[in-house]
Amino acid sequence: MKLSFTKMHGAGNDFVVLDGYTRALPPLTGAQVRALADRHFGIGADQLLLVEKPTVDGADFKYRIFNCDGGEVEHCGNGARCFVKFVRDHGLTGKASVRVEVKHGVITLTMQDNGEVVVDMGAPVFEPARVPFDASGLDGRREGADTLWPLPVNGVTRWISVVSMGNPHAVQIVDDAEAFAVRVDGPAIERDPRFPQRVNAGFMQVVSRHEVNLRVYERGAGETLACGTGACAAVAAGIRRGRLDSPVTVHTHGGTLTISWNGARDERAPLMMAGPATTVFEGVIELPA
């Protein structure tokens, strides 16, 4: 079967986007997702995005996200920005703002006149059981309004914030994000048994109260050039710890995101993420068996 696709990226976090809205697509297996995402024998991507018709009232579209390891995940901020550019560029909507069904709910995406996309990422969740994170038997320590949890990582105790942005995140503050051994500690944190669904590991360097450098080792994808939900989780943790003030400029290897959150006043407030979305190319590929 021939499969039309669009290759896109948001701040270097790259995606294969498939249109299941205007055409019927067969259910994709994990092996097929891995083959399409393979950078040597397929198209190459951190994740695959599938555009579908919504199944809930009040949503314009539904989108599903698959990591390059073939597993389906809950949310992707950079993918959400690419999603709204895709549906507008392909004439699926003329709206500047669309409501999109994702695995954990409905989010609102808005295309700005300057081409950037603003995503209402929803409110962060800090309760360990809802992340989910097993904090049983651990003695946390308070910093600001946050609780930091000790996690043994390669023989060293790391103090982490746990945050859900619809997907689980473990955030730690480091002195130098560029020099930190992200690809050593990242896999150990991702698969720590206290995270039953595994976790995205964020390593944040605070540059000023409005600026950070961030690297994220993503669950099922490894280190990526940018992670939208990771940026939101890091900023939320930093504000809650009293280290940051909104808005925050987040520098990643792939580009810059702007995160705003009024959480110092109301932790139920949604995080707003602004950043670019870029189409790289379009093509046709034979769907692997």
Swiss-Prot record:
InterPro entries: DAP_epimerase_AS, DAP_epimerase_DapF. Keywords: Amino-acid biosynthesis, Cytoplasm, Isomerase, Lysine biosynthesis. The active site is at residues 76, 227. PROSITE patterns: DAP_EPIMERASE. Pathway: Amino-acid biosynthesis; L-lysine biosynthesis via DAP pathway; DL-2,6-diaminopimelate from LL-2,6-diaminopimelate: step 1/1. Its EC number is 5.1.1.7. The record marks 169, 218 as: Could be important to modulate the pK values of the two catalytic cysteine residues. GO terms for biological process: lysine biosynthetic process via diaminopimelate. Transmembrane segments: none annotated. SUPFAM superfamilies: Diaminopimelate epimerase-like. It catalyses: (2S,6S)-2,6-diaminopimelate = meso-2,6-diaminopimelate. It comes from the Bacteria. Substrate binds at residues 13, 47, 67, 77-78, 167, 200, 218-219, 228-229. One of its GO terms (cellular component) is cytosol. Belongs to the diaminopimelate epimerase family. Homodimer. Catalyzes the stereoinversion of LL-2,6-diaminopimelate (L,L-DAP) to meso-diaminopimelate (meso-DAP), a precursor of L-lysine and an essential component of the bacterial peptidoglycan. This is Diaminopimelate epimerase. It comes from Burkholderia pseudomallei (strain 668).
